[in-house]
Amino acid sequence: EPTEKMYEMIELVNEILPKDKPRYLMGVGTPINILEGIERGVDMFDCVMPTRNGRNGMLFTKDGIINMRNKKWETDFSPIEANGASYVDTLYTKAYLRHLFHAQELLAMQIASVHNLAFYLWLAGEARKHIIAGDFSTWKPMMVKRLSTRL
């Protein structure tokens, strides 16, 4: 279904569900989907996207999406994500991770999966901080714009 339809259904269902119970959205999805769900009252998510995309060389970062198979990372010896949420982010470089993917080393998939899972945990934690601070509605659009960027 189109994402706009999914968001519409989340809003519809959340009007019906008891307000004092947690809301769970299964199988969703991208970091942007998660933020949109949170904005609409969803409390819990699960999905395979962080690990599936990681296994295919796609990394979610605070500044956007990285395809580690792209040639542009071949000589980029900077950390995977300088201020990332996981130990793998500063332990390995983009060039090394790209090399591992092209060499079809299983370690590439593990590093990317650890990175993406840590990123999702960071994102949910940041959303919570901004909800508590009362500025989620101004933080979210800025974050969505950053997360949409292809690096």
PLM features per residue range, with description:
Residues 81-151:
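C-terminal extensions of enzymes
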Residues 1-80:
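Glycine-rich phosphate/ribose-binding loops and adjacent secondary-structure elements
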